[in-house]
Each structure stands twice: as structure tokens, then as C-alpha cells.
Amino acid sequence: MKQIIHSFLYGSAVWAACTVSQEVKAGGIPVSTTEDGDAVSPNIVCVVCEDIGPWLHCFGDSVAVTPTIDALAAEGIRYTSIYGTVGVSAPSRAALITGMYPTHINANYMRTQGGQIARPPAVTGYDIVLPEGIKCYTELLRAAGYYCTNNPKTDYQFLPPLTAWDECGRQAHWRNRPKGMPFFAIFNTLASHEQKVWESAKDTLYVSPDDVVLPPYYPEDSIVRRDIAVMYSNIYRVDCFVRQMIDELKAAGEWDNTILIFYSDNGGPLPRQKREITEVGTHIPLIIRYPDGRLAGSIDDGLRSIIDIPPTILSLAGIKPPAYMDGKAFAGKYASPSAN
């Protein structure tokens, strides 16, 4: 469902609590500024995939076919030691929209809202209620003058407030913003989600089962080999999705004005991976590409957490992350010394 937030909401207490002020350039275009008056409104696009560990060629996986993501890594910085807080999507996405540990906001159970086949009939679903004062970080971006869109998945364990997004749904896109307005956009792809291992089982394979390397916890078996080959083929489909997102930015003349961030919500989709609090269940890839070419081709092996992504995005936008966040910014104006 497309959400349109009318102008009267901008005068609400949500905006009053933000540390970022707004000025207006000639022509009526809002521009985010810090309290010091520095312009800090780069466009930011996040491409978010599902159920992928660091099984990308640019992260050292020789089996993976990821030419677009490899090129993105060559132009940006790879974070090789970033982990989720859990091994499954909904609690991870609660963390990704708040910058909080799921346990800190009562979001650590999978799909609290219901919809789980394995849920006992007597156990009813519920929306978590965020503690007072905790917001979706996109509310702070919107307060700073950003046009914020999410396409389409939320899965936060709670319904996002109307103030979270200018648009949220399958048609949500940064192209819909008022002309000249800085944008923050998330595009989610399900191409690599767990279910695609069987849904795509008869689709084209881009990796041969004979070429995959079996982890030591799997038996030598043709079915296992094919499932892993399907997983790698789905990762290639994610690569194609990333190419589409980049091509759209380039076609609109926004590529050289946009920070692009690529990451997964949790680790792998296969047994002993997804849902497990293990290396393969929580280890994710993260790449940040800056339009000015800084840190191109570099690697950061510092220990990071998925809860660090929201404050880092705020910091990259020139917005001071709120003190309540469990995560720490590791890039941008407000990068925390303790995070580096």
C-alpha cells in the first residue's frame, strides 16, 4: 500500500525531536543541514537481499557468479566481519529499522504477528510495541528533508507508523519524489530467499552442481549439490537485480550523487544455516559505494553488527544517531570512535 504523508504531519513532534534543521534553496527544494550549517544530503539507496552469507566472488568465493556486485565492491568498501543478531529475517528487520537489538525491543521471536505454519493454535500473534521514544530511523531522515521509500518488504514485527515512509509498497520508488528532493530508498529482493531453493529448482542453473564445494556438515549427495547450485544461481539473480538498480540510477543521472549500500538480512538459506545463531547463520556481506570514489576497493575487517547499519546511514546523511540506539555508526560524520 502506497503511503502518502501530508504536509501537516511535518509539523508534528516527530520533527521537533530531530537534531537536524531544514533550509530551503531557491526554487523551494528542501536541503538537510547540520546544526553547523553544513549541507549533508547525499542520496542513499540500499539494496537488500535475503539469506545470503558472504558467498560472493568479491568476498573470496570462487564459485559465485556476481559480476555486478564485484564491480560495486571494486568501487566501494567491503565489510568482511559484519554479523546479524539472529539467523532469520523478521527479528533482523526489526533491528534494521530501529538500530536496536531485537531482544531490547521484544522482537526476538520470529514473526510475532503470526503467519507461522509451525505456530501452535493456542499461540496468537501480536505486534510488538516499541518502547517510548524509539523510532524507525527513516522518520529522522524524513525530518531532515529526505524523501524515503521502501519497496516492498517490511517484516518489522510491527506495522510501521505512517511517519516511517513517504511510500511503502511495490510501486515505491525514489523517482516519485518532488523534483530535486534528496532521497533515501530501500529495494528488497526475494530472489535468494530460502523458499527459492525449491521454487527455482527447475530454473536455469548458472552454477554447476559439480563445481560447488560441500560444507563439512553436509553429506556427499546429488540433491545437496543441486540445492547449493540453486542457491548460487539465486545469488546470481540478486546480482542482476543490483544491476537493474544501478542502471536506473545511471539513466536518471543520479549515480554520481548517490551512496549505494548492499547487504543481506541474515546468513544462508539452507539447513544448519538459516535460523541458527552460528557463523553461517549470521555472517552477512556489506558493501558501501561512495560516488566520490573514496575507499574504492578497500576492505574493513572490523567487527560490525547489523544494528550498526541504521546509525551509519543516519551518520552518512549528516544526522546524529539518537543516543538510545544500540548500534554505533562506523562511517560518516558521526562515526563512533568505539566502532572503529
For the regions a language model picked out, list residue spans one by one:
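Sec-dependent signal peptide recognition
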Residues: 2-13
